[in-house]
Amino acid sequence: MKFKKIILALACLSSPLYADQDQQLKSEIQRLQHQAEDLQAQLNRLQKQLANHKSSQQKHEQQAATKPAEPQSKPTVKSGAAIEEKYHSSKVEVHAPDAHPESISFYPTALIADNRVVTYIAGTPVVSSPFLGDRPAFDGSDYIVNISSINRDVRLLQQRRRLYRAYQKIGYPIPNMPIISLSGKTEPAATFNNPFRSTNTDGDITLGSSELDVAAALNENVEAYIAIAYDESPPAIGPRVNNSAFNLNMGFVNIGNLDKSPLYFTAGQVYVPFGRYSSAMVSSPVTMNLARTKTRPVIFGYKSQGDTGPFGAVYGYRSDTTLGRSGVGGVNLGYIFGFDNDINGEIGGGFISSVADAGGMQSTGSNVGTTFGGFGSITNGNENVRKTKAADVHGHVGYDRYNLTLEWVGAIQSFRPQDLSFNGQGARPQAAQAELGMTFMAFNRPASIGVGYQWTKEALALNLPKRRYVGVFNISIWKDTVESIEYRHDIDYGITQFANGAAPQGFVNLPTLGTGKSADTVSAQIGVYF
């Protein structure tokens, strides 16, 4: 009797255990059934591929049988003849972990074709392109390297927005990986001229500019940009190839998303948003030579979220000049307009609290130990100058194939005579530009012509001409290139006019004297963009 009770107790205790084992066995059976179904599906697919392959092979054999028999003596293959290679197409698969890239410390990925690894991807994939968004123009004018140096941060914002909108339009999600845009240019040039102060014709063949740009769109809100440029200016001593060095032309971080907010922020080394300096010429306009300012500011800006509308920016930076307070600031305002896709343009103006940091003010190109070399010159200049305010007004309008550019920039107060003078008085340098252009097709290639008139006032010490007449012809013979030829006629200040600028302590610069003469220059350039 006791044994029966013990047996019954053991049976009661073991029944839950058997139930659990039965459940596990059922789950295992279901899993094996699913695997068997998957294997059967793969087997059916392979059998279908085999049947298709046999069918195509039989068809090929039938076609070969209907061809006339080839002669037994085959012609000898000539040296250098191309040997036909056999190729086939395969589907490429991405083999990656199931986990999200940000949830694991390492993200090994591979591209597989024909059951072989084509390439490995270790880390986050990077997409590279010389432009963001639209298909590039034939002449490469929309490559990042050719974006205007003024407000380049805003133009990159707009490009990134167009790219993301294109993804969304076809149903793709916004990329969660950085898009690295690599772009660059090389522009060799030849010039022939008869300068103001020489009776001999001069000429030169040189590398006008060379630059490599990197724009990294990290996500929909942040972008970084670096431009490394070749320094073409000759050294003070020694052959000019000794100065063939690359330096940081621009580098900045931009934070903004025009789809979410019209506000943006930029910090780094950039050209401050003062002036426009647009030109189709080979040579830089006198407005740019006078006032374009590259420094290291912080910029708070506003850009209309539409293609047209108002824009503006305020900025501040530390000045290179040492007299008085070091801080310099400015403001830029404008409006972009367009009517019926035929007329478009931009008007704007700006103010800067010191124009003394402009490139043409810091360096005038004078030889060592001669005339004023710019406030930044060690031998012919001095940074201990008063900060002088300046303003800019510009406008650009395009209609069909025609475009017109107008701009004026200048100091709105006089420099101290010991800082920058004209005819013995404090100079108030100014510059203006008017340019008319037209695009057309020449020899079935995109081309353009442009004519311009430029003018300066009280800018003799900066080695700028009093008046300039200039014309250019541009054509894109090959894709991503622009071939240009320019004629420039400069007229100097009068022989009774003289100017000077700040000199190192204890020294005096030689005065810059007007000649009343004219100078003619012919320039030819080929620009290659990528």
Curated annotation (Swiss-Prot):
Q: Which domain of life is it from?
A: Bacteria
The alphabetized UniProt keywords are: Coiled coil, Signal
Q: Where is this region: Disordered?
A: 50-81
Q: To which protein family does this belong?
A: Belongs to the UPF0422 family.
Signal peptide residue numbers: 1-19
* Name this protein carries in UniProt: UPF0422 protein lpl2888
Coiled-coil positions: 20-66
**Which species does the entry assign this protein to?**
Legionella pneumophila (strain Lens)
